């Protein structure tokens, strides 16, 4: 708000709202649970596969498509595990990211060259040492509990 001649003038800032969907992709390997982490080319941060909702896609459709595009891995999504993260990447942008839990159907990945610098399968307990953002670390811990409960 600004003052002008004793009157309030409201400055309207147009907020951009973005929504992305993705998943914590996991597999069981030699009795251990491993999750798939991706390193983004532009920012260099480690996270989970995710991307923007396109057209009239559902959240689950977006998550499945983005995982396939970024990693080449097909998944079985668990719609009962749904975690959201909200943040503002820019002053005029509000972003919501919806994460599901996804069991990998195949394990060999093919990185999307334009966006992904590296992909790794890592032990779920070690993932918190690689993930860049605190919100992602919290979600991994919730995913670990959900996976163990479903076993």
Model-found features: residue ranges?
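Charged phosphate-binding loop/patch that engages nucleotide di/tri-phosphates or the phosphate backbone
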Residues: 3-9, 129-151
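Anionic group-transfer/hydrolysis microenvironments
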Residues: 24, 41, 125
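Short small-residue beta-strand/loop micro-motif enriched in glycine and branched aliphatics
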Residues: 45-48
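Unchanged
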Residues: 51-139
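Conserved N-terminal beta-strand and adjoining loop/helix that marks the start
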Residues: 7-34
